[in-house]
Structures are given as structure tokens and as C-alpha cells.
Amino acid sequence: EAAIIAMRKLPNVIMPFPGGVVRSGSKVGSKYPALFASSNDAYCPTIRGITKTELLPDTSSVLEIVIDGLTEADIRLAMRVGMQAVCKLGAKRGVQKITAGNYGGKLGQFHFKLREIMK
């Protein structure tokens, strides 16, 4: 929520999901042909016992923020502002890790590398 509040102050970007935040991570594709996306089981805390997980042992929630922007620069700025807002919360407020998916290039030509964005 802190990231959404910070990013909503910027022009040219929207976070299209209600409230701006999506529970659990998503991935491109599904075992059902009609579905374009599905939950990313590696980042879904509720099924960690039945699938390979990428989560830390004490992670109980994964949140995803989808950003749509007019330009690549607009999206990079929104990502930076959002990550800075989340980092200010820190581990004591529950932040363990920030990651980004690239989906193997299946969602477009742009790749946003977090370390580069935060420089």
C-alpha cells in the first residue's frame, strides 16, 4: 500500500488492479488453455507444502503490483518510487524481499532490472 500511495502521485502511470495490489504472484500461462495467466505456485504461500517454493520459511504473504505506463521511463520511475516507499517500511514492518518477474519475454519486449532502476 505504501508503494501504491507513492506511485499514484506520479503522472502517466496506473496500477490497474483494484487497490493497486494483487495477492500472490502471477505467471504467464496456465494448465487451462483459456486462461492467459495463473498464480505463480513458487510464490504462493498457501500451497508451499505441495510445490517447489521460492519463499523464505516465514513468508506468509506475497503481493504483486502491476504498473502500466505511457513510456518505459514512466514505469522505471514508478518502480523506483514504489520500491523506495516499501524499503522505508523495512523488515520490522514485514518486508522481506522485492523481486520482479520477466516472464521469459512473453509479456513484451521490456525488461526492468531492479538493481539498475535503484541506482
Spell out what each predicted region is:
Residues E1-E64, D68-F112, E116-K119:
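Conserved mixed alpha/beta catalytic, RNA-binding, or beta-rich assembly cores of soluble enzyme
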